[in-house]
Design a protein with these regions (language model features):
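Surface/interface-facing alpha-helical segments and adjacent flexible terminal/loop regions used
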Residues: 1-59, 63-160
């Protein structure tokens, strides 16, 4: 039955499981009723979802930085704003343990692949660095200012 409810109505299932876990925490004996396999799966998925969200936000930020580099005469104000928002949102969701699993080089490769296939006014981007110039410390910026975006752009030019 728990497996059927998990598949049919995950919201009801999660409410019931939360209630059972609260009762268990108060010392009641409810072990048999808890859908342990799915509870464990859901707890694990929370961490994965958060990591994927941060990876996505960082990829989008890098994408906009690469657009700024690739088309210096493009809509820079918009791209700068987008990069700042994505970096800020990523920093807000960041947790220290993510450092072990998030690889800036992979995020950069994804963003570079997207931007390298784009055109702006029928023009391809200026040459984009092949190697990721960023560390996680460069990218996790709680409230990025214009100067932070400028510093990240300089990394693309100088490789620093």
């Amino acid at each position: 039955m728990p497996d059927d409810l998990y598949t049919a109505d995950i919201l009801l299932w999660s409410d019931q499981q939360a209630d059972l876990l609260r009762r268990l925490a108060r010392g009641e004996r409810v072990n048999d009723a808890i859908d342990w396999d799915h509870v464990i799966e859901e707890v694990e998925s929370v961490g994965r979802s958060e990591r994927h969200a941060v990876e996505s936000l960082l990829t989008r930020a890098i994408e906009h930085l690469l657009k700024l580099h690739g088309w210096p005469d493009g809509p820079g104000g918009h791209w700068r704003h987008e990069a700042r928002v994505f970096l800020s949102d990523a920093a807000a969701r960041w947790t220290p343990s993510m450092r072990q699993t998030i690889e800036p080089a992979l995020l950069y490769a994804t963003a570079r692949g997207l931007v390298s296939r784009m055109t702006v006014d029928e023009r391809p981007p200026a040459p984009l660095p092949a190697v990721c110039p960023y560390t996680l410390d460069d990218l996790i910026v709680p409230r990025p200012a214009v100067a932070d975006i400028d510093a990240l752009l300089a990394h693309l030019t100088t490789g620093v």
